[in-house]
């Protein structure tokens, strides 16, 4: 299989929708439990971006640098929980700011910094909330894309389009809210049961 064929397969509508639903369900219902894995994936992507930056500006052997930096990023984020908490909180705050105040970009950065710091201090409740919201958003986006036929390329150009798609009508709002609430309750009950088993 040629790289172009593989890229077309991975970005096909079925692959994107399936990925969004599976990742959304995992994050929504067991996001806090697998936070170390989730954090490592974030580190992998950030390391990959750093590797791409290095190869563009300083180095010519792209594959080795990108792989090495991605692995280092994944290991750092897996071993140091605070990095994942900061990035998760910052991303959540940024997207909340972009959605609520799209004309004032500076507030998105302020909210990103605020949520990054808050997530360090109230890790459990905020991480449960964030993973439930991200998971529910991924599922609602997949449902919207499946119904309307919107492709992922149409969404990636503007982050606000993600929120517009998720909250486009009352049915999607209800789906999103139900998933968030169910995710929070499920994660809380699972956490409580694990604590009782340990005692």
Swiss-Prot record:
Give the bilayer topology. Multi-pass membrane protein
Task: Please verify whether the record's keywords include Nuclease.
Answer: no
Report the record's disulfide bonds: none
One Pfam family here: TM7S3_TM198
Q: Which domain of life is it from?
A: Archaea
Can you quote a single GO CC term?
plasma membrane
Tell where it localizes: Cell membrane
Its keywords, alphabetically, are: Cell membrane, Membrane, Transmembrane, Transmembrane helix
Q: Spell out the protein name for this chain.
A: Uncharacterized protein AF_1434
């Amino acid at each position: 299989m040629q790289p172009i064929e593989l890229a077309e397969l991975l970005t096909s509508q079925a692959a994107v929708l399936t990925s969004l639903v599976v990742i959304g369900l995992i994050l929504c219902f067991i996001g806090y439990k697998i936070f170390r894995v989730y954090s490592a994936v974030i580190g992998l992507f950030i390391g990959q971006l750093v590797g791409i930056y290095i190869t563009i500006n300083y180095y010519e052997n792209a594959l080795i640098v990108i792989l090495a930096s991605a692995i280092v990023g994944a290991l750092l984020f897996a071993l140091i929980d605070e990095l994942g908490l900061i990035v998760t909180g910052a991303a959540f705050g940024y997207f909340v700011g972009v959605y609520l105040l799209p004309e004032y970009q500076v507030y998105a950065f302020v909210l990103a910094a605020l949520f990054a710091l808050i997530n360090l201090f109230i890790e459990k409740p905020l991480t449960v909330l964030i993973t439930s919201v991200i998971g529910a958003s991924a599922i609602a986006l997949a449902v919207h894309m499946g119904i309307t036929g919107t492709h992922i390329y149409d969404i990636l150009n503007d982050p606000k389009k993600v929120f517009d798609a998720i909250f486009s009508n009352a049915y999607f709002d209800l789906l999103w809210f139900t998933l968030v609430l169910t995710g929070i309750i499920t994660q809380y009950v699972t956490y409580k049961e694990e604590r009782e088993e340990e005692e």
